[in-house]
Amino acid sequence: MSGGPAVRVSIESSCERQVQEVSLDGMETYVPPLSMSQNLAKLVQRIDFCQSSDSEEDGAERARAGREQWKQEPEEDEGQLKFQPSLWPWDSVRNNLRSALTEMCVLHDVLSVLKERKYMTLDPVSQDPAMAKTPQVFQLISKKKSLGTAAQLLLKGAEKLSKSVSENQEQRRQRDFNSELLRLRSQWKLRKVGDKILGDLSYRSAGSLFPHHGTFEVIKNTDIDLDKKIPDDYCPLNVQIPSDLEGSAYIKVSIQKQSPDIGDLGTVNLFRRQAKAKPASQMWHSRLEAAQNVLLCKEIFAQLSREAVQIKSQIPHIVVKNQIISQPFPGLQLSISLCHSTGEKKSQRSSPDKSKPDDHLYVLEHNLHQLIREFHKQTLSSVVMPHPASAPFGHKRLRLAGPLAYDKAEISSLQQTEGLLEKIIKQAKHIFLRSRTARTIDSLASRIEDPQIQAHWSNINDVYESSVKVLITSQGYEQICKSIQLQLNICVEQIRVVHRDGRVITLSHQEQELQDFLLSQMSQHQVHAVQQLAKVMGWHVLSFSNHVGLGSIESIGNASSITVASPSGEYAISVRNGPESGCKVLVQFPRSQAKDAGRSDAVQDGKWTQLRGAHREVHWDRMEGKNFVYKMELLMAALTPCP
């Protein structure tokens, strides 16, 4: 059996279906039978187009001869390559030609199938001839009924979807309301009273004593229609604010020279710029902040009004409508107004005569807010906190008395506290005095070119005191003319001037007094500059005085003078400078150069001729030079003999 030729046995598959799956309960699932196209594709996959077309006998003989030859080979020559000899010489050529012919035939068949579409056409399925054709009317009725059923299904589905969307929107709005309420609670104080949610806008928790309740109510926003599109600025939460806290407000503080008509003052006219209402500005947080600001402004104005009535001053304060008028200095008035705009009334058109620049002092408004917060802090700190009830034994007076006990003066000074109005009036006085000082210095600097005046303001100031350093110099001679350096300390009602040598002069709030003082200092600067220039040029200072008692009397300060002599002593220059009279320069020549010098019979010695003669005035306006010091330098250089 083993030595005989191999016999090929053809086994066909049974017609039964193959089992695809057996379930747990014993049910068998069969593979569905293949269609004609699937069966054809399966059979085509079995064809091996590379296999030769020899007969089965030739193949069997070659296989048997190959096996016999393989057995006859020795085992040690297994690695060597063995070639089977051909049965006849043209056997290989025949096989190659046959394979080439087979491939060409297959290629021809494939091209024919691709080119001719009739080979790819399948036979139509035969229909039952007994089936009668349905009339077209019945077809239309059936289609209409089918479409109606489908439409009802679609409408029911759309209704369910819209209902689900509305429920989701309601749930989302409820969630948004809760989240907004949580956010509101994190920023504002809320409490539940019955079925209402109330909030507090007042500053009572910070120490405020203002009697306004400042209560607002939180409500749910139900004005929106769920069937329509929700706007972008929609907020599920809304707040109800008291009507007297609606709108915006601020405290206007201004200093005016002429008092306006008090009876024409109103609330709306003070609001020059009406803010346009934006949709985003109607959110609850912006409305609550604006309402709290209105409440704070009303508290500030109420405190100022109460103090204005209670304070006893030489010039009483006036409280009219929403305005408080005070006079810090003669001819000036301080106006503090409460400007409240609810946005309901339209702003009146301002007349041309009232179109003035905004004189609102924002610094004082900011200081008012700081002062009221300090007042709240003091009120809150004065509350007695919990403390131990036990104390050491002994009499209370003996326990409190001692070497560190307060006397009557200290106790009375502690009891004297300044109110909000007094502090803001003092700050207004200081601000006005500082601005007027700066204006005076700037006017002198722009009006007088020689000498030059410079002001260096300090950045570190107080609400009641400021300082400025004033330098008076001459252009081109800044290094040698540094004698006039003033430190002005601007207080509430006076100005303290500190000289370079430490002298202190106190000036009042009058503008003319400061201007006269600076003019006298500028006049003295010219004389000091001549003194410093004489030292540099080698001239000798014969006399110097800041206050000359001779000559015309100056209405502003006193005149100053100096006399210098040339290095050889032949020439002398006398300078007299006054704030009003101006500069006067005299030159004294030797007697030998005097034209009208005659011989005296009494003086026969020639040495007396070397004495200087009378003074001659110099036409100072005709001198060349850009400033006083430069002209004086040219004059000294002309009178100095060459070595």
Swiss-Prot record:
This is Mediator of RNA polymerase II transcription subunit 17. GO terms for biological process: regulation of transcription by RNA polymerase II. It comes from Danio rerio. One of its GO terms (molecular function) is transcription coregulator activity. Its main location: nucleus. One of its GO terms (cellular component) is mediator complex. Belongs to the Mediator complex subunit 17 family. Component of the Mediator complex, a coactivator involved in the regulated transcription of nearly all RNA polymerase II-dependent genes. Mediator functions as a bridge to convey information from gene-specific regulatory proteins to the basal RNA polymerase II transcription machinery. Mediator is recruited to promoters by direct interactions with regulatory proteins and serves as a scaffold for the assembly of a functional preinitiation complex with RNA polymerase II and the general transcription factors. Keywords: Activator, Nucleus, Transcription, Transcription regulation. Residues 53-82 are annotated as: Disordered.
